[in-house]
Every structure is written in structure tokens, then in C-alpha cells.
Regions:
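Structural detector of well-ordered beta-strand residues that form the stable sheet scaffold
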Residues: 2, 40, 64, 129-131, ...
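Mid-domain Rossmann-like dinucleotide-binding core that forms the NAD(H)/NADP(H) cofactor-binding site
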Residues: 13-90
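A generic alpha-to-beta junction signature in SAM-dependent methyltransferases
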Residues: 33, 100, 124-125
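Phosphate-coordination loops involved in phosphoryl transfer and adenosine-cofactor binding
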Residues: 35-37, 105, 156
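Redox-cofactor binding/interface segments in oxidoreductases and associated redox assembly factors
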Residues: 41, 86, 110, 131-132
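Short amphipathic alpha-helix with an adjacent loop that forms part of the alpha/beta core around
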Residues: 91-102
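Short SAM/SAH-binding signature in class I
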Residues: 103-109, 128-129
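Glycine-rich phosphate-binding loop and adjacent beta-alpha segment
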Residues: 115-182
């Protein structure tokens, strides 16, 4: 249980807590985002994505967001994205590279997975932090993400998974999630 500020009713508090908590853990706790850095948020118009855009902007980051329609791109801008890219109309990775003058992004909050994760590696800055925060592209797509060790090593890139649902890995089975045993 958490204390709720008086300005929130219970429904608003519940709707606020999850997306902003996930965004905070992804960007700040795991991603180490600092003021002045550039962050890429995939799925910037969704619940966690829009929270990540707002949080990153509030922390003083330059924010690039991707979304899948003109209306969603505009929504990302209204949430504070400095640059919003419609991933369905072209090569979003080229647009990110241009926007960063080929330097890349310091932190990426990947809420999509799969091929998006693979392409995100193209736009990571040296020493960047790639946060695998969701899989709106489908959980099966996660297994198709081409994370090449050479790219990670030579780019000095950190890759981390972010999952808030269960703090204790031993509790996964109790929640109906069955992990593949490690051999």
C-alpha cells in the first residue's frame, strides 16, 4: 500500500502509479538518466511511454519519442517530446541518427521489443543504456531481437530488463508465469 496525495482519487492514483513507476525505474534507477542527456522512448504515446516522455523532460533530458500515427506523434509532442517520429512512415533509426548528429542516444526506453530493439542498437551512443521495458510488439518478438554481443561490447552499451510486476523471482510461478529453467 502507498500513501496517496489528497489531490488524487483512488482511480487516478492507481492510473498514475504504475506507468510513472515503470518509467522511473527504467530511466532513473536502471538507466541512470542525467540532465542534458538524450533519451529515446519507443511507444511514446502509450501509458508508460507518455510517462517516460514527461519524466525524462522533467529531469532535463532531450527527449525523442516514436509513435505509430500522426495523432500519436502530436500527443508525444504535447507531453514534452522535443522530437517525435512516426515509425510507420520511414526509417525512424535514420531520423534518430540525424537528430543526434550520429552521436546516438544515451538512454533508450524500449517498450516495443523485437526488431525495434535490434534497430535501437544502431542509435545507441557510446556508453549508452538500453532499457528493455516492455514488449508491445508481442512477447514472441522479444526472442527475435538481435542483440549482438560485439555491438554491446564495442559500444560499451549496458542492456537491462525492467519488470516491476514481481520483485521476487521465486514468486513468478505463483503468479502464473512459468520461466524456462536455466541449464
Amino acid at each position: 500500500a502507498f500513501e496517496c496525495p489528497d489531490r488524487f482519487d483512488d482511480h487516478s492514483a492507481a492510473a498514475f502509479y504504475f506507468p510513472f513507476h515503470v518509467a522511473y525505474v527504467s530511466l532513473v534507477e536502471r538507466g541512470g538518466l542525467k540532465a542534458g542527456e538524450t533519451v529515446l522512448v519507443h511507444g511514446g504515446a502509450g501509458g508508460v511511454g507518455s510517462a517516460a516522455v514527461q519524466l525524462a523532460k522533467a529531469l532535463g533530458a532531450r527527449v525523442i519519442a516514436t509513435a505509430g500515427s500522426p495523432a500519436k506523434v502530436e500527443f508525444c509532442r504535447s507531453m514534452g517530446a522535443d522530437i517525435a517520429i512516426n515509425y510507420s512512415t520511414g526509417d525512424w533509426a535514420d531520423e534518430v541518427a540525424q537528430a543526434t548528429e550520429n552521436r546516438g542516444v544515451d538512454v533508450a526506453c524500449d517498450l516495443v521489443g523485437g526488431e525495434v530493439t535490434t534497430e535501437t542498437m544502431r542509435v545507441m551512443a557510446y556508453g549508452g543504456r538500453l532499457m528493455l521495458t516492455g514488449f508491445s510488439g508481442g512477447i514472441e518478438a522479444e526472442d527475435e531481437a538481435g542483440l549482438l554481443p560485439r555491438s554491446i561490447i564495442f559500444g560499451n552499451i549496458s542492456v537491462a530488463g525492467v519488470l516491476l510486476a514481481y520483485g521476487d523471482p521465486n514468486a513468478f510461478g505463483l503468479a502464473g508465469i512459468h520461466l524456462v529453467p536455466r541449464e
